[in-house]
Amino acid sequence: MFKRGIATFTLDYGKCPKWLFERMVKLGREMSRVIIAEYGPDEFVKRIADPVWFQALGTVLAFDWNASGLTTILTAALKEAIRGEERDLGIYICGGKGKTSLKTPEQISLFGARAELSQEKINSLEYNSRMAAKVDSSLVQDGFQIYHHCFFFSQNGVWAVVQQGMNEKNVTARRYHWFSDDAKNMVIEPHAGIISDGQHTGLNMTARESENTQKISTELVQGSYNTLMKDLKLLSKYPINRKSNFQKGIWTSSSTPQSQVVSIKNKKQELTLLNLTDLNFKTHPVLLEDFTKSKYLQKILYEVNEIKPKNYEQLLSLKGVGPKTIRALALTAEVIYGAKASYEDPARYSFAHGGKDFIPYPVDRPTYNQTIATMRQLASKMKIGYSEKNKVTDRLII
């Protein structure tokens, strides 16, 4: 079952024209009504969590395919489209771009009360929203900074997240989709339908290959704080060699095409080092950091150590735990204790629709065709003018 997906595309800085946004709101209202009437509110939320479906919906509402603005404008248009009709339609949309994303918990609480959900369910929705944002900003450190977070949920408590990060260096944006169904483990491969137009190296703590690193990271904060601080100092004492210039006394214990795990031994201590090629850390700064210089990190680690989280998800959920904390623990687990993390991009395949820049890339053609065919059928049922309806269906080209 689809749980989470990622889409990567060009980063736009322009503003959506007022006339286009108003048009998208109008069409979005009609399309939302048709989808919910045809499939129900739970299915509407599920389809929002599908990157291909979401992209197709943006096309129906007359927005460019391959542009970051589709995410922010489409979610804003849908939110405006159902305003005042949430209870009747059975769906609720919270959050948005920038500062609006910070209002997500407040809006979940407000709409949850209107939907007459239990306080326990509302708290669960707020937790899922917060954790989805934390996972994609702290566990998937792919060079994209989250700046947009939108949370969808139904009258029955089914939820989806559509959030977006930007990479200004590469002038690209990446969209992350989450769906509640079967997302039982939020920190181990919570993604299935992943779409991207390129690979980006970085720390991927959601990969199953990072499961042992997660385990050791948790054990580090469950143990002695002083021992953890000594481990961090040990990292700065022995800089990691990326060019394979091993000194006397270093021996290779295992290797892969990308990396070599080595150990240094002396009378008092043993240190496991990782020799990594530039491929692994082309854009990832983790090896260049001296974690002993951050008083804030030491403070967070002390507070986490006092709590002693039971598992990695609880560790991530704690206040103050962010990308730097995750990196520090991951590198300690990897270098000193030999628990190698994954540095592979979670994106696995991509789809092509030309967009405004007409750049082709691989496509999941069967899924795309099925989505467009369904969208055409739904568009034919929209209560809009004949001319407008023709324009909508003309944009859906198989």
Regions found by a protein language model. Give the residues of each.
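Structure-specific DNA junction-binding interface
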Residues: 1-284
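Short acidic (Asp/Glu) and glycine-rich catalytic loops that position anionic groups and cofactors
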Residues: 32-37, 308-309, 349-355
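Active-site-proximal structural scaffolding
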Residues: 50, 144, 293-297, 308, ...
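Short coil/turn segments at secondary-structure boundaries
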Residues: 69-74, 344-346, 387-392
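Helix-hairpin-helix
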Residues: 287-294, 311-331
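Extended, structured, electrostatic nucleic-acid-contact surfaces
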Residues: 299-319, 335
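Phosphate-backbone recognition surface of nucleic-acid-processing proteins
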Residues: 327-383
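Intrinsically disordered, low-complexity, charge-dense segments enriched in Lys/Arg
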Residues: 375-398
